[in-house]
Amino acid sequence: MGEHQNVKLNRTVKAAVLTVSDTRNFDTDKGGQCVLQLLQVDNVEVSDAHYTIVKDEKVAITTQVKKWLEEDVDVIITTGGTGIAQRDVTIEAVKPLLTKEIEGFGELFRYLSYVEDVGTRALLSRAVAGTVNDKLIFSIPGSTGAVKLALEKLIKPELNHLIHELTK
């Protein structure tokens, strides 16, 4: 595995960011804006058409993700709707679309959340990642702390390697 740790892609990585929230708009979407800022640092491209907000509704989430799966993106990151509240349905919308689940992502995210961020409240997270054909999907909580942890500790360090493995 060590031979792939510093994989460099010969192209720009294209991402889509979906915020799932009944209350956020583009001015108040701190989680989605945090994703955009952290991706921009690594020259990951997110066009205006690939950043949006939908309500906590399974059909709305599924429809948007399916639309982006048909477009020229490498990775889709959803924020919000991953907890256990009645309205938290992101996982129910995304998981059935996955070809393969990357179980280690959710396990490591919850572990790091426990150790570095929220303690035992980490057990409330149902964060998930997986693949759909040659695309990656990550569904993470919407708090900026969770977004930073997921992107800085897990997603960004492995993104090129994951894309390389999916497309080789």
UniProtKB/Swiss-Prot annotation:
Pfam families: MoCF_biosynth. Keywords: Molybdenum cofactor biosynthesis. GO terms for biological process: Mo-molybdopterin cofactor biosynthetic process. PROSITE patterns: MOCF_BIOSYNTHESIS_1. Disulfide bonds: none annotated. Pathway: Cofactor biosynthesis; molybdopterin biosynthesis. It comes from the Bacteria. InterPro entries: MoaB, MoaB/Mog-like_dom_sf, MoaB/Mog_dom, MoCF_biosynth_CS. Gene3D superfamilies: MoaB/Mog-like domain. GO terms for cellular component: cytosol. SUPFAM superfamilies: Molybdenum cofactor biosynthesis proteins (SSF53218). Belongs to the MoaB/Mog family. May be involved in the biosynthesis of molybdopterin. This is Molybdenum cofactor biosynthesis protein B.
